[in-house]
Amino acid sequence: MSKSFVTGFPRIGEQRELKFALESFWAGKTSFGEVEKVAAELKKRHWNYQIDAKVDLISVNDFSYYDLMLDNIITFGAIPPRFAGLSGYDLYFSMARGNANSVAMEMTKWFNTNYHYIVPELSRDVKFNLNSSKIIAEYKEAKEAGVLNAKINLIGPITFLALSKTTDGSNALDHLDALSSEYVKL
């Protein structure tokens, strides 16, 4: 028997709540805590829409403050060296938007659509290291919100590598075994 699910729910909000919360934070008008409140409200609302629509499996980890590929970069520790020393949302948004010391990561079209994603930057020296905190936190958040049939969404390792660029001429797909080992840990 087939099961219904949504591969990814639009995350910005019907009134573009996430966009406005992020812009206010970036302008220094609000704290990141305010962005987190908006995000929590949106996730809960979106899960409830799916529950009300009788969707069989409710997607979690389909929410992102900026980009799901960027989330995967963080999750698997593929952070370019120029962002060393940063952490938390400073790291996350510096990778996406740049900062005074480092240029932002490149963006390109997701499978020829109008959506742009952050392009992972890999080299022979990349050492993948799983940080599943976002995924686990969102899964627990969904369960606490009453989602009984949660399904984790995640960009797969082949897609991640195929859409990456290398900074040293190496082949991104040469990292498949190492990256897959981190996926297995999930």
Report the location of each language-model feature.
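Domain-level signal for soluble alpha/beta catalytic cores
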Residues: 1-186
